[in-house]
From Swiss-Prot:
Stated name of the protein: UDP-3-O-acyl-N-acetylglucosamine deacetylase
Enzyme class: hydrolase
Keyword ATP-binding: no
Originating organism: Pectobacterium atrosepticum (strain SCRI 1043 / ATCC BAA-672) (Erwinia carotovora subsp. atroseptica)
Residues of the active site: H265 (proton donor)
Organism ancestry: Bacteria, Pseudomonadati, Pseudomonadota, Gammaproteobacteria, Enterobacterales
Cofactor needs: Zn(2+)
Gene3D superfamilies per UniProt: lpxc deacetylase, domain 1, lpxc deacetylase, domain 2
Highest taxon in the source lineage: Bacteria
């Protein structure tokens, strides 16, 4: 049986909030089978839980938020959610003593290291996947995102930025997903932004934690970070990272083929909701025998070592 995963032990880290610029303590805890992914704000009394749920997602200019029925929100969940998807973690409680998850270095890599440091525990309960049965496509102007049946998990993402720092040949990225591929090829890709946008937001008291420590920053001509890029195509790889996190908001790894052109958090979420709303388009599946499971989700050495 392919089993659900959680952490072996509690792990904690501190970072800076992108919005407030203040220190945030992040604590990730093991959870029993069928708990799902739960984000929890412990700065509120009583603490407020935000289960990962496609319908609770709100896209702001700066990040992805989860918002409950009382309009309470937790912000900047997308990169941690991508790390959970990448390592196939089904059950976890994530505490923060702030309104947001810390931004860390702007990628999913610090979260991957924390999760691997905590260790991955298999639970004696079958892991549920969402298997795509019919193609579903959403559009917004010239932007689109699509999910098709496929026995695995593949991603094909194209961006379209007319900017001297972003080479025209580095605007498409394809990935046959596995935990190893995610960690090595996707998790280290950082978010990016324009210096003028960051300066404008900070002048309005927003994005106070934004800096070159947690993003690729560009002006009209070049990348301003002293160390440059981690990959030639880091921009499109980060957009794929975002999509992996966005699609995991259903709480389950997806068996299907995702492709997108100029998509972002809002359109990715619109696609996920469109899939889930069409009961003919998907089904839950479990695997009694590992040999039946798509190679994409086989537990790699780095995860269960």
């Amino acid at each position: 049986m392919i089993k659900q995963r959680t952490l072996k032990r509690i792990v904690q880290a501190t970072g800076v909030g992108l919005h407030t610029g203040k220190k945030v303590t992040l604590t990730m805890r093991p959870a029993p089978a069928n708990t799902g992914v739960i984000y929890r704000r412990t700065d509120l009394n009583p603490p407020v839980d935000f289960p990962a749920d496609a319908k609770s997602v709100r896209d702001t200019m700066l990040c992805t938020c989860l918002v409950n029925e009382h309009d309470v929100r937790i912000s900047t969940v997308e990169h941690l959610n991508a790390a959970l998807a990448g390592l196939g973690i089904d059950n976890i409680v994530i505490d923060v003593d702030a309104p947001e998850i810390p931004i860390m270095d702007g990628s999913a890599s610090p979260f991957v290291y924390l999760l691997l440091d905590a260790g991955i525990e298999e639970l004696n309960c079958a892991k549920k996947f969402v298997r795509i049965k019919q193609s579903v496509r959403v559009e917004d102007g010239d932007k689109w995102a699509e999910m098709k049946p496929f026995n695995g998990f593949s991603l094909d993402f194209t961006i379209d930025f007319n900017h001297p720092a972003i080479d025209a040949g580095n605007q498409r990225y394809r990935l046959d997903f596995s935990a190893d591929a995610f960690v090595r090829q996707i998790s280290r890709a950082r978010t990016f932004g324009f210096m003028r946008d960051i300066e404008y937001l900070q002048s309005r008291g927003l994005c106070l934690g934004g800096s070159m420590d947690c993003a690729i920053v560009v002006d009209d001509y070049r990348v301003l970070n002293e160390d440059g890029l981690r990959f030639e195509d880091e921009f499109v790889r980060h957009k794929m990272l975002d999509a992996i996190g966005d699609l995991f908001m259903c709480g389950h790894n997806i068996i299907g083929a995702f492709s997108a052109f100029k998509s972002g958090h809002a359109l990715n979420n619109k696609l996920l909701q469109a899939v889930l709303a069409n009961q003919e388009a998907w089904e839950y599946v479990t695997f009694e025998d590992e040999a039946e499971m798509p190679l994409a989700f086989k537990a790699p050495s780095i995860v269960l070592a």
